[in-house]
Amino acid sequence: MSLQADFDKAAKDVRKLKTRPDDEELKELYGLYKQSVIGDIDIECPALLDLKGKAKWEAWNLQKGLSKEDAMNAYISKAKELIEKYGI
């Protein structure tokens, strides 16, 4: 299977987890997903009062500089870890 196909499968499988991952795990997945699909963050940091938006922005910004391929590989690894931990 190609890297893109593995990534797409991992993204699909993560949505089927039996238990919701904790916020830190979700933020890491979000950041890796956005880096994989879009690349380096290209939007301004949300307002201070937009806590959810700010958390998402920070998670994506942490992945800045990671190539799309490396981000996909990291996402796949994290997805496998969560699937083992929570089951699907």
Curated annotation (Swiss-Prot):
It comes from the Eukaryota. GO terms for molecular function: fatty-acyl-CoA binding. GO terms for biological process: fatty acid metabolic process. An acyl-CoA binds at residues 15, 30-34, 56, 75. PANTHER family: ACYL-COA-BINDING DOMAIN-CONTAINING PROTEIN 7 (PTHR23310:SF51), ACYL-COA-BINDING PROTEIN, ACBP (PTHR23310). Belongs to the ACBD7 family. This is Acyl-CoA-binding domain-containing protein 7. It comes from Bos taurus (Bovine). The gene is ACBD7.
